[in-house]
Design a protein with these regions (language model features):
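Conserved N-terminal phosphate-binding loop of PLP-dependent enzymes in the Aspartate aminotransferase
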Residues: 1-443
Length: 443
């Protein structure tokens, strides 16, 4: 089905969203506040959500496999989270000091993550990675950081490098060149950033050993979520841990997305103990949140007692009590049984999508782990950013719009997730709908 036909169908279904978009354009560039949620001809505006479903401004119901970009692990408006948030809101929305919920959430996270000996809260994953990088620089006395080509770690300047670069302009596969992701990123940031190729342990080791004396940290998304959910090859993360240990480089695990794959995140699943960890998304129950923590001797730089704190850490809404209450309620729901259900839903969905693709004989595949999945429109082996980068940008968009018009929400690039609010029937509906979309698009 052509993109024009899909767009026309979308316009017919979203007349109120179009009106709201035109109103929004008068006061906001692009009509909203998140680049990721925009798509042509305009984004649909969401009125409410409940369980695994959302309803847009036109009243259209959709099954939500986006989950606010993987953050709603319990689904929308989970009863225990709503109760906790409402109860706290009646006692106060924000305070000029800490609260009991902050302590309880910190205790829950440090129990789940043994590497996180101490933790502090912020308001987003971006703030979490920004502070983790700062802590690593303060502890090591070094200025450079290393990251992987294709990895996303938030929107602060220090990590907006080689997020989705054009391979023709970013050096060789084994020695990627740092490329600014956005206008406004200073050249000095590029000079302080070393870029590595995912899943190439030997190439990474060579680069790290050459730059080691200047590197404060290596920041890693263990699932490379931005590049297509590329599970690390056997021994790859272990090699990174060995090399960074030997060279005195802080290993930061960015688990803003990957924390949903087990009680102890990807570090538990893969058996790696990082020096620092960043969290966000699921730990706030749907409210704005971030956290960073790790080795106590590193985190001590944030301890203000006796004037010994090396790093000032402020934020009017850090550890907001309403957010903390939602986080505590969410963590209570994330039991071993809950993760077993999430894994089963993810396995069922990936198996179903694989069957659809095999029947269609179209060049595509699905990657992922636990409750996360990503549909790629290529059959080539996916190992790093360059191999997973789409060669045809329109095909993922056609899939997104086809699903959207048929009552299922994914992300525009193909990333999706299951929530605890879902059932096998919800997953089967996704697979059936995906099958119809593929069949209409040449399959």
């Amino acid at each position: 089905m052509s993109i024009e036909t899909l767009v026309n169908d979308y316009k017919v279904k979203t007349t109120r969203s179009r009106q709201m978009y035109e109103e929004a354009l008068q006061v906001m560039p692009g009509g909203n506040s998140r680049t990721t949620t925009f798509f042509d001809p305009y984004p649909f505006y969401i009125a409410r959500g409940a369980g695994p479903r959302i309803w847009d401004a036109d009243g259209t119901e959709r099954l939500d496999f986006n989950g606010n970009y993987t953050s709603l692990i319990l689904g929308h408006a989970h009863a225990s989270v709503v109760e906790a948030v409402t109860e706290q809101a009646t006692r106060g929305m924000s305070f000029p000091g800490p609260s009991e919920h902050e302590v309880k959430l910190a205790e829950s996270l440090t129990k789940r993550l043994p590497s996180m000996e101490a933790v502090r809260f912020v308001n987003s994953g971006t703030e979490a990675t920004m502070n983790a990088v700062r802590a690593a620089r303060a502890f090591t006395g070094r200025s450079k950081i290393a990251k992987f080509e294709g990895a996303y770690h938030g929107t602060h300047d220090g990590v907006l490098v080689s997020v989705s670069p054009d391979p023709a302009k970013s050096g060789s596969r084994k020695r990627p060149k740092p490329v600014a992701y956005s206008a406004g990123v200073p050249d000095t940031v590029l000079k302080h950033t070393v870029v590595l190729p995912w899943n190439d342990a030997d190439a990474c080791a060579k680069i790290l050993e050459k730059q080691g004396r200047d590197l404060a940290a290596l920041i890693v998304d263990p699932l490379m979520a931005n590049a297509g959910l590329l599970v690390p090859q056997l021994g790859f993360l272990e090699r990174l841990r060995e090399v960074t240990d030997r060279l005195g480089i802080m290993l930061i695990f960015d688990e803003v997305i990957s924390f949903r794959v087990s009680e102890g995140g990807a570090q538990q699943r893969f058996g790696i103990r990082p020096d620092l960890t960043t969290l966000g998304k699921i730990i706030g129950g749907g409210l704005a949140v971030g956290a960073f923590g790790g080795r106590s001797e590193v985190m001590n730089a944030y301890d203000p007692r006796g004037g010994k704190g090396k790093i000032s850490h402020g934020g009017t809404f850090n550890a907001n009590p309403v957010t903390m209450a939602g986080g505590v309620a969410t963590m209570k729901e994330l039991t071993p049984e809950a993760y077993a259900k999430l894994d089963a839903l993810g396995d069922r969905l990936r198996a179903g999508v694989t069957r659809v693709l095999a029947k269609s004989k179209q060049p595509a595949q699905v990657t992922g782990l636990g409750s996360l999945f990503w549909i790629h429109w290529t059959k080539k082996r996916l190992s790093d950013y360059r191999s997973s980068r789409p060669t045809e940008a329109e095909r993922p968009l056609r899939t997104f719009l086809g699903l959207l018009n048929d009552g299922v929400l994914l992300t525009q690039r193909g990333l999706g997730c299951c929530s605890l609010a879902m059932t096998d029937a919800d997953v089967d509906r996704f697979v059936e709908t995906f099958g119809r979309v593929v069949a209409k698009d040449g399959g």
